[in-house]
Amino acid sequence: SMKEFLAELAITATPEGMLKLSRGIYEYFDYEAGSTNIRTTAAEAFAKRQGVCQDFAHVFVSLARLAGLPARYVCGLPQGEGTTHAWGEIWYNGCWYGYDPTRNQLVDEGYITLAVGRDYGDCPVERGIFRGAADQLQTVFMQVQEQ
């Protein structure tokens, strides 16, 4: 269970404890595109031990909250080339601290925040509705670099 996972890693409700948690998720999970979808819950992803950045972030946020810290889901862009990315942040001693369990690293100035919320549902890249027969295909590719 998620509680047992926290206990097994001896996680404390501190920035250092959350770094340990982020590393633990990175080591526990397999990155597997297509193994989950936008409706997959943190508990489901945790049980499968696989997912994508969205799932890693959901699990991190859920476990941080379970450890007793306010936490939020973040959608944005990491430095380099690719698509959107997700990570988690905790509120500690008046500051937000970011952790990227997908890449096993702290969030730094190379990350650009697009949206924050309780989970993916609060910050999708796009949102809308169709009326009548419709279909949609979206491809996102970005490049972030220092200038």
Could you tell me what each predicted segment is?
Residues 1-51, 59, 120, 131-147:
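Secondary-structure boundary elements
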Residues 23, 55-134:
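Hydrophobic/aromatic-rich core segments of domains that either
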